Amino acid sequence: MAPSHLHERSPATVVTVDVTAARELVASAGLRYLDVRTEEEWSKGHLDNSLNVPYMFITSQGREKNPLFVEQVASLFTKEEHVVVGCQSGKRSELACVDLLAAGFKNVKNMGGGYAAWLQNGFPVHNPPRSG
């Protein structure tokens, strides 16, 4: 009998690019940007032309994974489309990429460092007007 580890499916390898490479891919190569932060985080500032599909929701019990995440992404992107995925620090977006790759999305890239690194580099963002 073959060892059981030979039958395990290893998770797809997530390709992570730094924020400078991500900016180039979005600005010059025309890749679309998927922001997986919460709607509240996204509303405080985001990359221009980004699409927001939260990977997690904040509930009274803490963070809970969005059960419709892959379905919602599939309504916005084709499985062949090249997409840069980002969050606040690069952790949720990496998990999101794992789920998307497992669902058959072929060309997703994680933005390492996330929105925080984007801001640290002084790259352009869309900040909604503050009320009050």
Predicted regions and their residues:
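Rhodanese-like catalytic fold shared by cysteine-dependent sulfurtransferases
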Residues: M1-L31, E39-V84, K91-G132
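Conserved P-loop
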Residues: D35
